[in-house]
Regions:
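Short helix-perturbing small/polar motifs within transmembrane alpha-helices
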Residues: 1-40, 60-142, 166-167
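Short helix-coil transition sites and intra-membrane helix breaks within transmembrane domains
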Residues: 46-51
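Transmembrane helix-bundle signature of multi-pass membrane transporters/permeases
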Residues: 123-127, 154-159
Length: 169
């Protein structure tokens, strides 16, 4: 509902047409970062980590607003994720992954610019950014065995649910 409501805002309409000012993009970065934070809190605790939908807000910010919006939203939501669990098993990896997901959403935006929103491209982007997140968890989280166990449990549901979430928005 929050995402649907965002579409009615003039700033989001400007973002979709490529006419948003720098200040409007900054404000929208905060909004999409807040959506990412909400995705963290709506997540489910799994093995000292959080299976979440943080990527939907962050990647969507990148898809709709480009790399600057995606990156900034990723820094906001990823920084929050790190700060709520400093020293946690996945704090660093999930924080880094969130920034990467925003940037990847922004890269897709560059491909879609001045074209209608493409749900299939958003679905593929969702799959790609979630795979990147799982890879970052495996690369940065320790102990490695715990990271493998976590990814084994959360990868499929997070890839499917978050990809569909991006596509239907």
């Amino acid at each position: 509902l929050c995402f649907s409501g965002a579409y009615t805002k003039p700033q989001v309409k400007k973002l979709l047409t490529g006419k948003a000012t720098r200040n409007e993009k900054l404000a929208l970065s905060v909004i999409f970062g807040a959506f990412g934070i909400a995705g963290t809190y709506l997540g489910v605790p799994v093995q000292n980590a959080i299976a979440n939908s943080r990527v939907v807000g962050v990647a969507l910010g990148g898809i709709l607003g480009g790399p600057m919006v995606g990156f900034a939203a990723g820094v906001i939501a990823g920084g929050h994720r790190f700060l709520i669990d400093i020293g946690g098993f996945t704090a660093i990896s999930c924080g880094v992954a969130t920034v990467a997901e925003g940037l990847l959403g922004g890269i897709l935006y560059a491909k879609l610019k001045r074209k209608p929103f493409d749900p299939f491209a958003a679905l593929i982007t969702g799959c790609a950014v979630e795979v990147v997140q799982m890879a970052i968890i495996l690369l940065l989280s320790r102990p490695f065995e715990a990271a493998v166990s976590l990814v084994h449990i959360i990868a499929f549901p997070m890839i499917v649910v978050n990809s569909i979430g991006l596509a239907i928005f």
